[in-house]
Structure formats: C-alpha cells, structure tokens
Amino acid sequence: LLDAVTHADTQVNQRALVVIAIVLHIHSNRLWLYPELETRLSLLNEDGSFGKQLNRIYIQLLRSQETEKIDKKMREEIIPEMMKNVSIMRNMKYGFEENIEENDRNPDWEKAFEESGLGDKIREMNELQLEGADVYMSTFAQLKSYPFFQNPHNWFYPFDMQHSSIIREFGLKPTGENAILSLILQSGFFCNSDKYSLCFTMAHIPQAQRNMMLSQMTSQDLNELMDQSKSSGLRQYAQRPDVISNQYIHDLYRFFKLSQRRHEFRDIF
C-alpha cells in the first residue's frame, strides 16, 4: 500500500490512501509495534503532502458517517418535494413560442419554481453534492441486485465501459446513440458502483423508452453537455484526486451496507 501511494496512476494512489487511512484508524494502537512502518510513514510525509492527503481522506470518511442522515433527508424531504412539483413543472408555460431574444428566461417559470420550494431543495442537494456528500445512496440502493454484484470484488472495480459485463449486457459505445450516456458515465457525479448499476438498468429498458428518457433533455441541454470544453471539464473533474478517493469511499460504503455478503465482513463504517 505504501508503494502504491507513490504510483503515477491517480486511481491507484488514491485508493491506496483510503485503505491506509482505514488501516491506521482501526489499528492505531498497534502502530508503535512496527518502528519500520513508522519510519516509512515519516519519510512519505517529509514534505507534508502525505499528511495533508490523509487528513482529506479522514474528512471524507467522517462525512460518510452522515450518509444515513442524508439518505433519510433525500427520501423524506427532497425527493418527495421534487415529485410533488412534477405536475406543476409539466403544466407550466415555458414560453417557447416567445422570441428568445426578448425573454431568455420565463418569469412565470422562475416564480413558480421558487414559490414551490423546489428551488431550495435542489440548491440544498447541489450544496451537499459539492461538499462531497453521498446524495445518491437512496437512488441506487435498489439497483444492486444484478448478477454483477454477486462477486464482492466487482463492488470496487473502477468503472470501465469496456468491461465484459457492460459489453455483454449493453454494448455501450462512446459514440452514436449512447454518446450522452457515455459522457455522463465518464463524469465524476456517480461512484463506480453506481455507474455499473446505471448501465445495467438502462440495458433492461426498451430502446424506445431509453430514447424517450434522453429526449427529455432540451436541445440546449444536449448542446451544452456535448460542448467540447464542458465535456472536457467533466472528465477533468472526474480525474481529481479528491473526487476519486471520495467515489472509492462511496463504493466501500455501498458494499458494507448493501452487499448480500456484507455480514461476512466487519463493517468499517
């Protein structure tokens, strides 16, 4: 693990950091029994960067302790509020027939959006996500029954669109009809485990319905999402060390809370 911390691949060194933080926390009272290990840790932290990274990992691990509270808030407050306002949003006059230069944003939409309380809920969800909170646990908890998740190691497998299970089930390609979904899967919004769940779920949705779901996005949304600079920004965000370590912690959390074999292991959370 200590060798892996210095690996050039960010996926490797960040995962190693997470595991080191967990091991040091669980076995902190035994560290003094291994002076050579203490020496190695001191050498790694000569410039202070190792300690700063560990501190960041510990904060992320502490934040994961709030997942149940956030999950409850999502299920009981935020999601119901969003569902309650679906009909309002659908029946609202968006003003597409108006000259876009005269009115870029429909005031009726903004007023109803704020008065419904939906705006506050969405902002709250966005703030939680920006802080690194696990806001998707409740959404994906019911999507872990696929055969893929029967193997414990698959819960921690870095997401790969060329994984045999993806190709066999979905035939996902980075171009063509799946381009939008591919871009979403390359972003840092979801942890690896949830990306696999999303793929398997989409694979079982008829093509017509899948197209209808994607068609819900306006042409402007699609253009923005496919914009080269913005799509590049999404990919860069996904490669940030703090995003990778946080996603790995979310993967671990899902395994210890949702896996059918979770009772065979000590719950580190």
Regions found by a protein language model. Give the residues of each.
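HEAT/HEAT-like alpha-solenoid repeats
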Residues: L2-T6, S42
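Residue-level detector of extended alpha-helical repeat arrays and alpha-solenoid scaffolds
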Residues: N13-Q14
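Alpha-helical repeat scaffolds
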Residues: L31-N45, K73-I79
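Extended alpha-helical scaffolding regions
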Residues: D71-L143
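Alpha-solenoid helical-repeat scaffolds
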Residues: Y157-F269
